[in-house]
Amino acid sequence: YYHGESAESCLTQIEDLIDTLVPMDVREARDAVQTLLPPGAARNALDCALWDLEAKVVGKPLWQLAGLATAPKPLQTAFTISLGDPAAMENDAAKAAAQGFGLLKLKLTGEGDRERVDAVRKGAPDVRLIVDANESWAALDIEAEASALAALGVEMIEQPVPVGQDALLDGIKSPVPLLADESCQSSADLELCARYYDGINIKLDKAGGLTEALKMAREAEACGLKLMVGCMLSTSLGIAPAFLVAQAALWVDLDGPILLAEDREDGFRFEQGMIVAS
């Protein structure tokens, strides 16, 4: 969950709207939800459920309603290498590469990052690498750090500085794109992101659903921002709407169901590093 949400808090928010939404038609209800709930998991759940209901009512696949020109195709998804000592991360990277994952995402802390990336590169010399700096580079020479990681084959860096300190990136010349994650919650943040970042990471639990995520993707493209689509830990049901938005993304990080002990039946398949709709 995002920002301290829980299943119970989300359910309460949704139940409080039942009497308001029941008299509305599905499109009216979906429009109303955008203002009745703040961005977050509750609005995401309700918004996506209403998209699904509308698709059933009109008898069209959801991808058509969402404005896609063709049915969604399989996508290469990142597999996340959890933070650990370099030797453990090297071993995890080697295992992931052996399972067919060609894009790995590393969690970093601002301390020992180069050593960790170097170890992962040794464990998986042929994969693509992206990293999430987790707001940890405020005290570092950001240009030097980005250049060092680029030399190790890193092709993108997420959220190098803390939320609210985005101006630290003003004038920074990075050899690889810098993307906003925590600094980009919804479309209201795009103006700031266009000033300091090269792209954004859209997560439906941040944005508050498919409606806002599609809007963000359109407006990001208009601003010249590169697009990544990520996820919180969730089943294939939670990933499915993000999979539609991800069709237009340069980087896809939808490995949430893999990290669960058990996914729902008829969920996505993960084959050779690709996420494939059932």
Positions of predicted regions on the chain:
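Metal- or metallocofactor-binding catalytic centers and their adjacent structured scaffolds
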Residues: 1-58
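Conserved, mostly hydrophobic/aromatic
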Residues: 46, 59, 104, 132, ...
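Anion (oxyanion) recognition and catalysis
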Residues: 56, 172, 221, 246
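Metal-dependent enolase-superfamily TIM-barrel catalytic cores that perform enediolate-based chemistry
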Residues: 63-176
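Conserved beta-strand positions in the central sheet of alpha/beta enzyme cores
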Residues: 103-105, 158, 201-203, 228, ...
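Catalytic cores of alpha/beta
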Residues: 139-149, 186-196, 208, 216-217, ...
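A general structural motif
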Residues: 158-162, 178-188, 204-212, 260
